[in-house]
């Protein structure tokens, strides 16, 4: 219980929406707890420190999934010692130090891999507890901050990844990945489908086109899925691509087994009401799907965290990887044509899912902050070659 004024500083990043969603889930949960003595502030560190360079990096990151996969693969799988010699480790350092001096937080929470925090914990005098919410299912070196007080991870396998690289097991808690509470709230699936002019007796295949960043080939996929899965109907989420929504609506406007949508705030309802989802394996999306126990097909996952997430879900029996659209269509047909495998996948997800991650994490944060001491003055130094990047 927080009985005196305390402050949590959340460091996040806007490379994709997932980290921001996790941050918002935690902030909302803490606000719902009505703690008069607790204040929570959040900062997109890299964007605030280097707005122009970070914007360029974000565009490269998004395009890397389509055009620069090998380059991103090289970055993701590079050896830890290379990161230690890279300027990226010092990216945003001065901004972070200024934040700590100004805000004087009692606890720092990372919801984005932030290597610069390692500089503070290793090279500076800092006695502020540092906690990390990891938003993927397999460990990457950028998530590790030496001398951290706590890591919140998705599964027992993720915890073992940390232990294998020498992290103290007592600092790693298996909580699941925090998502919005609505994904754990029951809904009337049948009524939702009826309200959207779909047949509740058919198997609903959910496709998230916006997740792939491409706008071609989905018309053929929809047509082939319906041709090879006799009792299926397709819901296509086009995201912000108005061109894709327009073209698919024109093609399937008279087909009662196809519903074309643009951007939607109702992914929760669609996940809950569908039997299968074709998507990319972003950490938050698949955690939301996991909470709704909807088996997933991962179409051509990019090397890096996407592929690692997909491999983990396939290994656990929660999803399948398809390297091509044709392979995805075959998997859909196999799972929807009276195959018990789909039922078994749903049952496995029901047994293995971890509920109420957000609440569990927030309660532990309060326990940590209740034992934190008053932050002291921060001092330290960085290598000369890195000083250009520490703004």
Swiss-Prot record:
Family annotation (Pfam families): Glyco_tran_28_C, MGDG_synth
Biological processes per GO annotation: enterobacterial common antigen biosynthetic process; glycolipid biosynthetic process; lipoteichoic acid biosynthetic process
Family annotation (InterPro entries): Diacylglyc_glucosyltr_N, Glyco_trans_28_C, Glycosyltransf_28_UgtP, Pro_diacylglycrl_glcsylTrfase
E.C. code: 2.4.1.315
Any single GO CC term annotated in Swiss-Prot or TrEMBL for this entry: plasma membrane
PANTHER family referenced in this protein's UniProt entry, alphabetically: MONOGALACTOSYLDIACYLGLYCEROL SYNTHASE, MONOGALACTOSYLDIACYLGLYCEROL SYNTHASE 1, CHLOROPLASTIC
Record protein name field: Processive diacylglycerol beta-glucosyltransferase
Species in which this protein is naturally found: Staphylococcus aureus (strain MRSA252)
Name of the gene: ugtP
């Amino acid at each position: 219980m927080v009985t005196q004024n305390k402050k949590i500083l959340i460091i996040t990043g806007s490379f994709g929406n997932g980290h921001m969603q996790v941050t918002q889930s935690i902030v909302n949960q803490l606000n719902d707890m009505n703690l008069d003595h607790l204040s929570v502030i959040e900062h997109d560190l890299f964007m605030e420190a280097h707005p122009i360079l970070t914007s360029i990096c974000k565009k490269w990151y998004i395009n890397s999934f389509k055009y620069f996969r090998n380059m991103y693969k090289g970055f993701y799988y590079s050896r830890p010692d290379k990161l230690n010699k890279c300027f990226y480790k010092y990216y945003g350092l001065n901004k972070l130090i200024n934040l700590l001096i100004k805000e004087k937080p009692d606890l720092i929470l990372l919801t984005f891999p932030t290597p610069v925090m390692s500089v503070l914990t290793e090279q500076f005098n800092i006695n502020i507890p540092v906690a990390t919410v990891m938003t993927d299912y397999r460990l990457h070196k950028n998530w590790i901050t030496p001398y951290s007080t706590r890591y919140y991870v998705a599964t027992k396998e993720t915890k073992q990844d940390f232990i294998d690289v020498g992290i103290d097991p007592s600092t790693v808690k298996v909580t699941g990945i925090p998502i919005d509470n609505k994904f754990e709230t029951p809904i009337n699936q049948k009524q939702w489908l009826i309200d959207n002019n779909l047949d509740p007796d058919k198997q609903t295949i959910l496709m998230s086109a916006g997740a792939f960043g491409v706008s071609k080939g989905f018309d053929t996929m929809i047509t082939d899925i319906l041709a090879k899965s006799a009792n299926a109907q397709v819901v296509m989420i086009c995201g912000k691509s108005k061109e894709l929504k327009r073209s698919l609506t024109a093609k399937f406007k008279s087909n009662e087994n196809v519903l074309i949508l643009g951007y939607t705030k109702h992914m929760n309802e669609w996940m809950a009401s569908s039997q299968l989802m074709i998507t990319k394996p972003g950490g938050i999306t698949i955690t939301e799907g996991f909470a709704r126990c909807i088996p997933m097909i991962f179409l051509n996952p990019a090397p890096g965290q996407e592929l690692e997430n997909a491999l983990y879900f396939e290994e656990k029996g929660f999803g399948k990887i398809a390297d091509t659209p044709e392979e995805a269509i075959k998997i859909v047909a196999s799972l929807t044509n009276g195959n018990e495998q789909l039922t078994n996948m749903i049952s496995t997800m029901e047994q293995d899912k971890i509920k109420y991650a957000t609440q569990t994490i927030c309660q532990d944060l309060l326990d940590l902050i209740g034992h934190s001491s008053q932050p002291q003055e921060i001092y330290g130094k960085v290598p000369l070659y890195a000083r250009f990047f520490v703004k």
